[in-house]
Amino acid sequence: MAALCLLLLLSLAEAIDLRVPELPVIGLLDKDVILPCWFTPSEGFTPKNLSVFWKLPNQQQDYGFVLGEDLQENQSPQYKDRISLFHEELSKGNMSVLLQQVRLTDEGIYTCFVNVQNSSSASVSLQVGAPFTKPTLHLEPSEALKPGDQVTVTCHTYDGYPEANILWQNGEGQNMTENITTSQVANEKGLFHVQSSLSVILETSDTYTCLVFNPVLQDVTHASLTVTGQHLSFPPLVLWVTVGLSICLLCLLVALACVCRKHLKQTCEEEQENAGNEEHEENGELKTAMQPLKVTSPGEDDDAECLE
């Protein structure tokens, strides 16, 4: 810090035209990131005449390069062996630093101080982001659903940073904003677990999509679930009872058909037997009726009368 104060005291009125990004620099968690800072050097510029300091966020020590040498002894433990200049680029006016293995605690404002006969400073904002996992969706209840039932679709996603923006859409791509409950809890590493629940009245069939938006990384991950309510769906017990009753009814109909067939056969036999008896009786009566009459003479009749 004393070296930085000395650098500022030695500065002249005319400042170097330092250039840094206007927008925040985005660093991925556990990846390397470059914090840009550069100027256009004059002819004859050499790094031996250069002094560079980077003021690190929330740190008492700074990272510096003075008159051709790195200042490593005052480097913060948090940044030790993780931050460095591009020494081969210094002669081109490139004062950028490489920050390795970005951590969540690295987020903040970094200020670049440069002195070459005169001095200037510029600040760079670093934002850290970690992508969320692909969401998983769960349905409750998930069985024996029919239109009109109330169901809850729950979306889970993990290990993202910072907090996510959650959006629900139906199958037509329309945003759903009612009956939504969302919670975001950070773990011991500072990464967030997001749980969002959507309660809906089930229709015949619809698709629900959970979109997870990372505001720093500007990326979206999503998952969809199609839910169908069956009008004619039966519980397993009812289905088996229905099948059992159908089988019993079929057996009963078969038995009834056998009884009817037997009864019909017996009736036919009796009718045939009765018809045979009637025919026999008719034949007997006809035979008796057709017997010849005995013819007697007149004399025989007189003798018979005399005998009487």
Swiss-Prot record:
Any single GO CC term annotated in Swiss-Prot or TrEMBL for this entry: external side of plasma membrane
SMART domains: IG, IGc1, IGc2
Region (Disordered) residue spans: 270-308
Domain Ig-like V-type: 21-125
InterPro entries xrefs: BTN3A2-like_Ig-C (IPR053896), CD276_IgV (IPR047318), Ig-like_dom (IPR007110), Ig-like_dom_sf (IPR036179), Ig-like_fold (IPR013783), Ig_C1-set (IPR003597), Ig_sub (IPR003599), Ig_sub2 (IPR003598)
Predominant location category: membrane
Membrane-topology annotation of the record: Single-pass type I membrane protein
Residues spanning the signal sequence: 1-15
Keyword Magnesium: no
Spans within the Extracellular topological domain: 16-236
Bias type Acidic residues, positions: 299-308
Protein name: CD276 antigen homolog
Upper lineage: Eukaryota, Metazoa, Chordata, Craniata, Vertebrata
Gene this protein is translated from: cd276
